[in-house]
UniProtKB/Swiss-Prot annotation:
May play a role in photosystem I and II biogenesis. GO terms for cellular component: chloroplast thylakoid membrane. The keyword Coiled coil does not apply. Pfam families: PsbN. Keywords: Chloroplast, Membrane, Plastid, Thylakoid, Transmembrane, Transmembrane helix. Induction: Expressed in leaves; transcribed from the opposite strand from the psbB-psbT-psbH-petB-petD operon, it is found in the antisense region between psbT and psbH. The gene is pbf1. The chain crosses the membrane at residues 7-27. This is Photosystem biogenesis factor 1. Disruption phenotype: When grown photoautotrophically on soil is highly light-sensitive with extremely slow growth and pigment deficiency; on sucrose-containing medium under low-light grows like wild-type. Strongly impaired photosynthesis; both PSI and PSII levels are decreased.
Length: 43
């Protein structure tokens, strides 16, 4: 394959991996450890 194709595939893979990790952190198992500042500020 050409170098440009490999670089494009690598960058696309990184982007998909980062997006998947961000979604997992936001909605998956670790999300229960996140604090909610709106819940803490009850006025």
């Amino acid at each position: 394959m050409e170098t440009a194709t490999l670089v494009a595939i690598f960058i696309s893979g990184l982007l998909v991996s980062f997006t998947g990790y961000a979604l997992y952190t936001a909605f998956g198992q670790p999300s229960q450890q996140l604090r909610d500042p709106f819940e803490e500020h009850g006025d």
